[in-house]
């Protein structure tokens, strides 16, 4: 207990018999009305409801109970323990309130559920729905740098399609040159609005197709010796 407070129940008598002198000494300055402390065994329910003009009062749990320069009524119902402040709630959620929730409110208003909590929850849900339903623009998708083919769901590149004019020009070039130099490949790519890589892949596939066709033709045609043997018979 602080030494600035004096227990009024303690008999202030001196062994020398100067009782009258002790009663004449003022305990506090003029105009100062201090809180009367009580022993630890004194119950909280018997605290008198009295109006004090204290400038500010703070609870031990770092949460402000009242902060007003005007007169404020401190009664037994305004004092709460740390357990009550952290656990007591009408909704049973156990949410710890901030310091501003206890300013200038009665005990009934302090634990009244906030009417704006439902609105805040609705705004949060709306924001979450907006996040998941946001439109996907074409520039947000993964695209093929050559012809604009969108990648599939498994990240596979789409099959490149050529127009009829592009196919005709490539076939004409393949008829004269089955292998292209890089310079010629760049010229054809610029003329047909394609990339050098697409031209290279198309010629590789076309050469494989041409080899298969030649192999099939050679296998179906009989050799010269077989034809002569059949003719001699």
UniProtKB/Swiss-Prot annotation:
Membership in a protein family: Belongs to the Antp homeobox family.
InterPro entries, per the entry: Antp_homeobox, HD, HD_metazoa, Homeobox_antennapedia, Homeobox_Antennapedia_CS, Homeobox_CS, Homeodomain-like_sf
Region (Disordered): 89-127, 214-233
Positions of short motif Antp-type hexapeptide: 136-141
Major subcellular site: nucleus
The name this protein goes by in its record: Homeobox protein Hox-A6
Biased segments, Polar residues type: 107-119
Pfam families: Homeodomain
Keyword DNA-binding carried by entry: yes
Role description: Sequence-specific transcription factor which is part of a developmental regulatory system that provides cells with specific positional identities on the anterior-posterior axis.
Gene Ontology annotations for the cellular component aspect, listed alphabetically: chromatin; nuclear speck; nucleoplasm; nucleus
Encoding gene (name): HOXA6
Listed GO biological process terms: anterior/posterior pattern specification; embryonic skeletal system development; regulation of transcription by RNA polymerase II
Organism superkingdom: Eukaryota
Species for this entry: Homo sapiens
GO function term, MF aspect, one: RNA polymerase II cis-regulatory region sequence-specific DNA binding
Compartment(s) of residence: Nucleus
Secreted found in the keyword field: no
Keywords, sorted A to Z: Developmental protein, DNA-binding, Homeobox, Nucleus, Transcription, Transcription regulation
PANTHER family to which the protein is assigned, alphabetical: HOMEOBOX PROTEIN HOX (PTHR45659), HOMEOBOX PROTEIN HOX-A6 (PTHR45659:SF14)
Entries under PROSITE patterns matching the protein: ANTENNAPEDIA, HOMEOBOX_1, HOMEOBOX_2
DNA-binding residues: 155-214
Lineage, top ranks: Eukaryota, Metazoa, Chordata, Craniata, Vertebrata
């Amino acid at each position: 207990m602080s030494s600035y407070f004096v227990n009024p129940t303690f008999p202030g008598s001196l062994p020398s018999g100067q009782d009258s002198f002790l009663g004449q000494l003022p305990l506090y300055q003029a105009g100062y009305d201090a809180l009367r402390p009580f022993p630890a065994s004194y119950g909280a329910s018997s605290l008198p409801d009295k109006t004090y003009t204290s400038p500010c009062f703070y609870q031990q749990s770092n949460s402000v109970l009242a902060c007003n320069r005007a007169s404020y009524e401190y009664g037994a119902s305004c004092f709460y323990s740390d357990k009550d402040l952290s656990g007591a709630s009408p909704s049973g959620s156990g949410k710890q309130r901030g310091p501003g929730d206890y300013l200038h409110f009665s005990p009934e208003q302090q634990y009244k559920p906030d009417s704006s909590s439902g609105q805040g929850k609705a705004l949060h849900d709306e924001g979450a729905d907006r996040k998941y339903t946001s439109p996907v623009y074409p520039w947000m998708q993964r695209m093929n740098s050559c012809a604009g083919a969108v990648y599939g769901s498994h990240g596979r590149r789409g099959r490149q399609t050529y127009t009829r004019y592009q196919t005709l020009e490539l076939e004409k070039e393949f008829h004269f040159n089955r292998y292209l130099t890089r310079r010629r490949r760049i010229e054809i790519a610029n003329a047909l609005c394609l990339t050098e890589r697409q031209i290279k892949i198309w010629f590789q596939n076309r050469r494989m197709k041409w080899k298969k066709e030649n192999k099939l033709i050679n296998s179906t045609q009989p050799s010269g010796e077989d034809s002569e043997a059949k003719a001699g018979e």
